[in-house]
């Protein structure tokens, strides 16, 4: 237990508190040496040797002061420096099967790093950490390549691995045909295109609309001198309530003759740090039921957006067996068949 606590202390120190407030020299050299020279557990000694090897890098890095400032202000330069330092440490911990240490360090980071809402930070970590671990373990990429891919720390053109070679069929291109506008009196179709509705079923009129989270208008009282969330919606950090989406679509159905509908996804709200599969399916089924009621006998050509998945943006390919996306595809298929596809 004491060795584990030492490992947690070292990881938290180098990845979290140091970035925020504390100088590395505040830890006694004797403390580090006593841990390193303990022969009880070679694995933990290897781990701590790696950690202490980063001490000099932290103290001597010419960009470290900029990192501390930029991290507080969520600048991409700070994220890149943090990624450059953290990626090899994370890989080492994964190799040693010490993911619990990363979890503990991230939890402390979320509690101490005041520039991020703690609930958003912890929720996002819970949603995405397992995926990050899997990508880091499976991706045949260097640390620099990972940081370039995640945060655009370097142009991806710097790395040949990101330059895909797409071979086209060895056939001549067809001769372009000039556009042929329809003749006067040709039949006309009216198409309704719905996209990015982002309905928030937790929307609360009068609540705080400029909160510390990416999505507001859900709870809390507005600050003195600030207006609360409007009944029909708000232009601040808020999605629309269900009744606004319903009224808008009813209005469209009443004043327009719609022949068919393009429906290109992104129904759920933007609370991506605490969404579950059940939340996403509730949003999808509820909005689809509303569409079927308001536009009966209309064919709806649908697509899926990045926000339908849980976690958001993640659509695992079929070769990922541990966390497949069939739970979403099956529900979408049922709904799309109902829409006439």
What positions do the PLM features span?
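Non-catalytic terminal accessory segments
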Residues: 3-6, 18-189, 194, 206, ...
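Short, flexible/disordered secondary-structure transition segments
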Residues: 94-97, 117, 157-161, 204-205, ...
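Classical eukaryotic N-terminal signal peptides for Sec-dependent ER targeting/secretion
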Residues: 1-13
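Structured segments of extracytoplasmic/periplasmic soluble domains
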Residues: 89, 149, 153, 197-200, ...
């Amino acid at each position: 237990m004491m060795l584990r606590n030492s490992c947690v202390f070292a990881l938290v120190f180098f990845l979290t508190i140091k970035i925020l407030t504390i100088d590395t020299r505040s830890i006694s050299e004797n403390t580090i040496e006593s841990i390193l020279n303990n022969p009880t557990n070679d694995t933990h000694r290897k781990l701590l040797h790696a950690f202490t090897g980063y001490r000099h890098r932290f103290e001597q890095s010419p960009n470290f002061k900029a990192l501390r400032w930029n991290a507080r202000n969520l600048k991409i330069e700070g994220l890149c420096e943090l990624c450059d330092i953290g990626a090899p440490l994370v890989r080492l911990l994964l190799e040693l099967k010490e993911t619990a240490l990363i979890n503990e360090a991230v939890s402390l980071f979320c509690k101490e790093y005041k520039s991020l809402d703690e609930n958003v930070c912890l929720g996002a970590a819970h949603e995405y950490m397992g995926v990050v671990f899997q990508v880091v373990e499976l991706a045949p990429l260097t640390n620099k390549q990972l940081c370039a891919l995640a945060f655009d720390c370097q142009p991806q053109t710097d790395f040949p691995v990101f330059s895909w070679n797409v071979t086209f069929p060895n056939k001549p291109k067809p001769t372009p045909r000039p556009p042929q506008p329809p003749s006067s009196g040709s039949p006309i179709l009216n198409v309704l295109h719905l996209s990015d509705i982002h309905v928030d079923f937790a929307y609360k009129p009068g609540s705080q609309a400029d909160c510390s989270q990416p999505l507001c208008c859900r709870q809390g009282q507005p600050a003195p001198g600030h207006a609360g969330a409007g009944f029909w919606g708000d232009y601040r950090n808020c999605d629309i309530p269900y009744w606004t989406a319903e009224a808008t679509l009813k209005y469209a159905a009443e004043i327009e003759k719609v022949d068919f509908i393009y429906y290109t996804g992104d129904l759920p709200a933007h609370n991506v740090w605490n969404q579950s599969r059940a939340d996403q399916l509730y949003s999808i089924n509820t909005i689809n039921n509303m569409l079927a009621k308001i536009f009966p006998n209309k064919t709806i050509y649908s697509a899926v957006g990045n926000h339908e998945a849980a976690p958001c943006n993640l659509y695992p390919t079929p070769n990922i067996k541990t966390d497949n996306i069939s739970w979403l595809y099956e529900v979408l298929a049922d709904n799309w068949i109902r829409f006439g596809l």
